[in-house]
Amino acid sequence: MNKILLKRQILYNLPKYFKNNIPYTITINKSNQFINNNCKNNNNNFRKLNFTTTTTTTTTAPITNNKPKSNMLYSPKDRSYEEAVNALLTLQSNQTVIISWTKERRDNKEESAKFLMEEMRNYCKTLSIDLERESIIHVAGTKGKGSTCAITESIIREQGFSTGLFTSPHLISPRERIRINGEMISKEMFSQYFWNCWDLLIKDYQTQLPNFFRYLTLMALKIFQDEAIQCTILEVGIGGRMDSTNVFPKPMVTGISALGYDHQNLLGNTLAEIALEKAGIMKVGIPIFTVSSQLPEAINVLIDHSNKVKSPLSIVPSIDQYTISSGGGNNNNNKIESIGLKGTHQLENASLAIALANCWFKKQTFKDVNEIFNSENHKQYNYETNNYNVTQFTPLLKSIELGLKNCEWAGRAQHFTNPSHFPNMDFYLDGAHTVESSIVMLNWWKSIVNTTTTTTTTTTTTTTNNNDDDTIHILIFNSTGGRNPTSFLTPIIQSIDNKEIPIFNKSIIPNIIIEKPIDKKYYINEIIQSNQSSTATTTPIPDNAAVKQTTEIKESSTWEDFVVECYDKLSKKSHPCITADSIESSIEIAKELSENGTKNVKVLITGSLYLVGGVLKVLLKEKSFN
């Protein structure tokens, strides 16, 4: 067996070697000192192995009647939804293991990918998930992949098909990740399938269950299959090639949204390396679509890889090339001027979604879909060669027009008001967190502060006032996942200096670690983990795990202080930036600046989807983690 994978198995599967108390022999490489340390750190759960530190050694473990401690697996009090969430939160790896396995994935990509996919296929076999299903739409990307999936789902649902949508992360509730026909699944369905999967996986894997992200992926696949969903749309978690969602050998169609720099510790430091990881979702003979905004370094990789695996690639057209019927036939059509999701950047995502939906429709055998594609234009499209062009699908189907208009996606260019609790306050939320997405978010914010109006509520009427010097502008920002806040903040400060946007009367950096222990653990783990590792362990995670990944932080007492330092350095302290103990307190500060509703306030919340989710939770007055 390959030593790298054996080391990986030792780290995550120590209890399996003790099963039935039989002796075993293992071979480890020169980096086995890490395994020694890992065992010592976890001596409450594992018997210590007497590894040596020579370059290569063979060790036989002693026979003993000791078994793994019972705390290796969560013991639920009941089979409720709340206990399902509690159990789910234990399926996360400690930081030491995450860092080690992240390095293995980066340094040994081919072997790691084979191992991860084989492991995922085994999990699916245990849960009787049919991987030969072909009704899958699979989408990767750096920016806009979630929005693309949401628009695609909306279009297909408007045509009358049942849909299953799996996305990540969630904003408030883990149920958001799994949606049927546009609605997140109920607590009853969540708990039913969670415990069903739990029992089946424990039977085959004892305490070695899939980690947080993988478990939810498996749950989603099981639900969509057993509920007989006609179309499944899967958003990649991180990358593509090694992602848990990449387990289907023959999806119906795949897509890659705009690419940029994110998760470099896993995917690589160049755009070409990142693009190659994303291209890993391409399959032989399966159409692949991407957007025209890809930079040359990225698109060249996508083209080369599509030719290599014989996955026909098509670059989607600009959305303004499509027309929609105005009721007078093909000779009386209109351009698409706007869609349900705000921000001009969503138009590119919409064009990608249109192509994915059209391809999915074309490949169906249902009678009503065949009747849809009965025109000579539609018949010209061949998904085997993916000769996609606008003329084949113009004017667009009515379902596509409705799907574009009716799509909603929380936390992305979202305008929120709650006059009863926050009078005269407008909240603008966008989960942008990369350098590229910060520029897109900024363009959206410019359109708001320069052309829109602010809502003013009185005791009797609601009117609108044009933006003026009396409007207070507030920024609530934080950065997670070890990302450099300076990169994100730079275009914002430059726009202020260039007088393209108003100065922020106050910028607030809240601590986004929720005070409740269950929320706190969730936020820390999601920030440092996502789906980086494969198998879970219940070793406790340090409270400061998420903030100790950047050496620069050591100069500041907290991560929030560090972000303030970055902000002050960029702005030369020309406008105030402060920290807040919590998201709740940052909202209260904003409310106080409005003089409790007597002044108009516009609040921009950005930098992290976790921050956006926390703010939405406060604004919606949902105090419990549900």
Curated annotation (Swiss-Prot):
The reaction(s) this protein catalyses: (6S)-5,6,7,8-tetrahydrofolyl-(gamma-L-Glu)(n) + L-glutamate + ATP = (6S)-5,6,7,8-tetrahydrofolyl-(gamma-L-Glu)(n+1) + ADP + phosphate + H(+)
Keyword annotations of the record: ATP-binding, Ligase, Magnesium, Metal-binding, Nucleotide-binding, One-carbon metabolism
Amino-acid positions noted as binding Mg(2+) 1 in the UniProt annotation, renumbered to this chain: 168, 235
GO biological process: one-carbon metabolic process; tetrahydrofolylpolyglutamate biosynthetic process
GO molecular function: ATP binding; metal ion binding; tetrahydrofolylpolyglutamate synthase activity
Annotated residues for binding of Mg(2+) 2: 263
Claim: Metal-binding is one of the keywords in the record: yes
Biological role stated in the UniProt entry: Conversion of folates to polyglutamate derivatives.
Family of the protein in this entry: Belongs to the folylpolyglutamate synthase family.
Protein name listed in UniProt: Putative folylpolyglutamate synthase
Record organism: Dictyostelium discoideum (Social amoeba)
